[in-house]
Amino acid sequence: MKLNKSYILIVVLLLSLFYSSVSSTKTTLIKSNNHYNSDNSNNDNKNININNNNDGDGDDDDDNNKILITPENQNHLIHDIGIDSSSTEILFGSSSNSGSCGEKNNTKQNALANQREANTIIFIIMLILTGSVLIVYFIISLDIPFVPESVAVVTYGIILGIVFRFFYSDIVNHVVSFEPENFFLFILPTIIFETGYSLHKTDFFNNIGPILMFAVFGTIITFLVVGFGIYIVGYFGVSIALSLKDSFAFGSIISSTDPVCTLAIFQALNVDPMLYILVLGESILNDATSMMLYSVVEDTSTRDIIISCAMFTVVAIGSVILGVVMALLLSLILKWINIGKFPALETIFMVMFSYMSYVLAGALDISGVLAVFFFGITLNQYGAYSLSPYTKLTSGQLFRTAAFISETFLFLYFGLSLTAHEFKFDLGLFSWSILFTCLARAISVFPMCFLLNKFLKTKIPWVIQVAIWFAGLRGAFAFSLSLDYISEDEHMNAYIRTNTLLVVVFTIFVFGMGTYPLLRVLGIKTSQTDQSLDNISKPMSKQTKQKDRTKLYESFDDKYFKPWFRKRVPPLANEAIEIFEKMVIQSSHDHELDSNPLRFDDDEEDDDDEDLDFDSDLDLNININTDSIHQSDNNNNDNGNNNNNNNNIIINNNSQHHSNDGSNNKNNDTLPLI
């Protein structure tokens, strides 16, 4: 495919802006440092050397005759020497007025300098993120399936980190000063909530048994294999020797498969639904297991191990209950408070409650990841039906966009961290860590799938098992735990953090780039038509819906939960929303070229003979107002007078207007589709 001139223009513009911004950043940093140094020199304590043996030659020969004047001893010195108050300000200045004014001016100047520096750094970060988005766009446009977006962004971060490290080291130091607590507070909840909110619930709960087996027992197996393995090779001198506690701490850290990296790759490839849901569920739920194992390592006594195992059950159940309760509470608010006319308020409620569930879980020492994940699932099941049609259609895209930005920043942070990290590398430790990680993954996947196939009606094929083994990517969760861990031997902290970071990058590059070729070799279905941002966390295909759900749960849900927590929406509104969604989906696929949704041919005419046909001159609007919909048949008659019915789908094609009665009904809630 030939590159358009617009691509080259965008790249040139981006590079020019980047160079100018980097230069301005360096200038700002130099000025702020010089200003800070000058302020420190000007704010030193005033001193006066009083020499009782002054011979007039200006030399101070006797150091014992020197008296240091400071604000603390100034008053005592004045009294002892006998200087009157009128001469005090001449000798020392007004310590109460001029000193305070100088301090205020210096403080104000420092604040302005810091503000300029912060604004420049933020601009640099935004510019780097813009470059990351352009890279993702180029990968999709050029149709490079074997290079996931995550790998490309990490590589982009490494290249920028190298440039900054040698020329503008202050910039990379500011960027990588991002604390692990900020990752857990801002980035992770956004990604996990969007995953739960857009998850296909039927696939998830139909496979909850295998998911729990992988998430709990598989994580414990990885913890034991890696911990024992690292300790044994260190004991025999094959690699650097870690203590038993440090070895198992590393095992608990590396046992966490990261949902962000896994989701980014699997969603881009649109893999088989069973593979997607098993790996997704494991990566989400095993965080609680990893945290439990990590806390056990802190104290290895038998009593604490038993307590930690019991606490793991409490944490898991409590996290699920908290997420469900918060979602049901929001569902009641959306049902009984009529805020459908204010879509922005509905979206704000959803964002606030999702974060409240996450931070409240952290305050209660339970898993915020599990809480916000099940909050998203429950909200989609009940609260979403009380949202206005406009919010239903826009909130999903908003959450997908926020998750995409968070993922991009995270992968970029990985790349920059590699160049700013204080490395203490041991080849033996790294090599054995990779070997034991892959071995532990194989031990936890293949025997467990063999046992599950003995009891499950839906078998896990061998090709899916191989793909699950290959999908054990590590990511930000493991790296954040390594930053939090403090070894009893201080110099081992750097080894553990370096080794964890290298294992994370290795799995992202090797397993990430090898996923697509492996799926092709195994013959597992993939699709590139709905890649990246347009399809982040896309629900599973309707063909994968299974009909073996428990009838007891269905009847209980239909009889109690749905009437309690869902707003009753008339069927006509639901039908209109479904038609609108189909129009949006088809409008994106009608212009599809070479199986890529971001490519359009301006000269190609649309010859699709589907039920809904779109031309370039078609102006399509949908009018929905659920407040004026009634179930009575009197409002749906065809007597030519439909002024009270605001549920018509009006299609305007410049010269003609189609409606039920041939009239033009005005509606304030018009949603432009094109």
Swiss-Prot record:
InterPro entries: Cation/H_exchanger_CPA1, Cation/H_exchanger_TM, NaH_exchanger. Its main location: membrane. It is a multi-pass membrane protein. One of its GO terms (cellular component) is plasma membrane. GO terms for biological process: actin filament bundle distribution; actin filament polymerization; cell motility in response to potassium ion; chemotaxis; chemotaxis to cAMP; establishment of cell polarity; establishment of cell polarity involved in ameboidal cell migration; positive regulation of actin filament polymerization. It comes from the Eukaryota. Keywords: Antiport, Ion transport, Membrane, Signal, Sodium, Sodium transport, Transmembrane, Transmembrane helix, Transport. GO terms for molecular function: potassium:proton antiporter activity; sodium:proton antiporter activity. Induction: Expression is induced 6 hours after starvation. Down-regulated by Pseudomonas aeruginosa infection (strains PAO1 and PA14). The keyword Plastid does not apply. Residues 31-65, 591-674 are annotated as: Disordered. Belongs to the monovalent cation:proton antiporter 1 (CPA1) transporter (TC 2.A.36) family. This is Sodium/hydrogen exchanger 1. It comes from Dictyostelium discoideum (Social amoeba).
